Amino acid sequence: GLMSVLKKAGKHVAKNVAASLMDSLKCKITGGC
C-alpha cells in the first residue's frame, strides 16, 4: 500500500541524508573540502 511505499522512500531519503552528512563530516575532519 501507500504507507509501505512512503516508508521505503523515507528509509531511502534517510540513508542519502546520513551518507551526505558523513561525507561532509569526513571532509571537515580531513580538511579535504
From Swiss-Prot:
Q: Which organism is it from?
A: Rana latastei (Italian agile frog)
> Which residue ranges run through the membrane?
none
Q: What is the stated purpose of this protein?
A: Has antibacterial activity.
Which tissues show it?
A: Expressed by the skin glands.
This protein's UniProt keywords: Amphibian defense peptide, Antibiotic, Antimicrobial, Disulfide bond, Secreted
The entry's protein name is Brevinin-2LT
Q: What are the disulfide bonds?
A: 27-33
Q: Name one GO cellular component term.
A: extracellular region
Protein family: Belongs to the frog skin active peptide (FSAP) family. Brevinin subfamily.
Pfam families for the chain: Antimicrobial_2
Q: What main location does UniProt list?
A: secreted
